[in-house]
């Protein structure tokens, strides 16, 4: 009988010890959770401006001309160039780069066929009316030509255009020029300093009629054989894309 009582007492002691251990572990877990809940989280570093960026890819697959002299002639297929196709490829890469960094960027034209300038302008101005013209910018991507594209020409270089007069577009062009001068070392940068800045001024419909800051870039001459080789090269494409992406970001950070 005495042995049985001793066994019962020992079992009771073990049960109490186990309950004490379990309670201590539960308290430790509670304290740990409280500590985790009280951790100071890093502040958000998202300082991206709330600006809608439109990237316009000039022309369409039904736009006449707009091709290099050798295109479709089978002379040197590696020098075939169709502006609408190249514009879209570059615009898509600019879009992807900015989108990947969290910017609100849109492709103005997603159709393959040429969309009228009036419709392009309407799309931009509709957004301007929704969010405010100071919250929208437009960059229209093109490649230049000195003639009809049937013969090789001597004209070369990169340039950007704004509408006539002093406008907020001039500032956007200024940042694009700054990047072009860094990225296109040894290549011609075409400027017009007659009005005190580097960009060229023109009454291009898409610049004159949009309500927001707008710049049209002419990314070298596709009817100059040296310029064409450059913009068809991996390095040339990379630098054209980088110029637009960095120029846009630097402009947005400055306004």
Q: Where on the chain are the PLM-derived regions?
A:
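Short, low-complexity, charged amphipathic interaction modules
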Residues: 1-26
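Active-site histidine-acidic residue metal-binding/catalytic motifs
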Residues: 32, 37-123, 147, 154-156
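Loop/turn elements at helix/coil->beta-strand transitions in domains of secreted/extracellular proteins
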Residues: 50-51, 100-106, 131-138, 185-186, ...
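Active-site-adjacent mobile loop/cap segments within catalytic or ligand-binding domains
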Residues: 54, 140, 144-147, 191-255
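Solvent-exposed loop/turn segments at secondary-structure junctions
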Residues: 59-62, 110-115, 143-149, 165-168, ...
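Extracytoplasmic/secreted envelope proteins and their assembly/folding machinery
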Residues: 88-95, 118-121, 157, 169-177, ...
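Mature extracellular/periplasmic domains of secretome proteins
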Residues: 117-134, 204-209
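Active-site-adjacent substrate-binding region
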Residues: 169-197
């Amino acid at each position: 009988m005495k042995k049985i009582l001793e066994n019962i007492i020992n079992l009771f002691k073990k049960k109490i010890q186990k309950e004490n251990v379990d309670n201590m572990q539960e308290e430790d877990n509670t304290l740990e959770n409280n500590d985790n809940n009280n951790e100071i989280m890093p502040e958000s570093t998202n300082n991206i401006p709330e600006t809608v960026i439109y990237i316009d890819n000039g022309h369409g697959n039904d736009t006449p001309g707009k091709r290099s002299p050798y295109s479709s002639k089978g002379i040197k297929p590696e020098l075939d160039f169709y502006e609408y196709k190249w514009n879209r490829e570059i615009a898509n890469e600019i879009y992807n780069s900015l989108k990947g960094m969290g910017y609100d960027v849109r492709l103005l034209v997603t159709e393959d066929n040429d969309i009228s300038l009036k419709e392009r302008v309407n799309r931009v101005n509709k957004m301007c009316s929704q969010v405010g013209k100071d919250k929208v910018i437009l960059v229209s991507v093109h490649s230049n030509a000195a003639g009809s594209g049937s013969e090789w020409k001597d004209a070369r270089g990169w340039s950007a255009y704004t509408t006539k007069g002093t406008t907020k577009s001039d500032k956007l062009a200024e940042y694009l020029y700054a990047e072009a001068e860094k990225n296109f070392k040894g290549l011609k940068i075409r400027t017009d300093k007659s009005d005190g800045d580097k960009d060229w001024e023109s009454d291009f419909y898409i610049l004159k009629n949009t309500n927001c800051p707008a710049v049209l870039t002419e990314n070298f001459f596709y009817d100059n054989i040296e310029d064409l080789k450059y913009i068809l090269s991996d390095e040339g494409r990379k630098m054209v894309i980088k110029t637009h992406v960095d120029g846009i970001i630097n402009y947005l950070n400055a306004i």
